[in-house]
């Protein structure tokens, strides 16, 4: 058994800053642990669910300002985490996110458009867990030292700065 894989978030980068901690789907639980560890000026936790069957709600409320979005609008903002940010007119200096690829793409675009430092944790299936098989590769702006192409091995590089 191998794990955990990849690199964690650097919580010290958020010190003295307003932070978004954003999670969706199976990316929600890792954001809770990050919220517990992080010391920053303002901690805004934005999590997305499909419906009212939310989980870890009380724990998130104890860790920071919680904003919820649901696809069906049954709890919080109707839509996704980006809809919640826009509806609540939230502002941040740094973003940490974990969740499905479409959510992470939207967060990356938002961060780039607004000049916000952004760190994402990518979700991919991992076969070997040591970077040899390249099953978990995704495209990246930076060249991977292993393959010398614009890819990241999620099992080895996991966290991405965008």
Q: Where do the model's predicted regions map?
A:
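FNR/FR-type flavoprotein reductase catalytic core
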Residues: 1-125
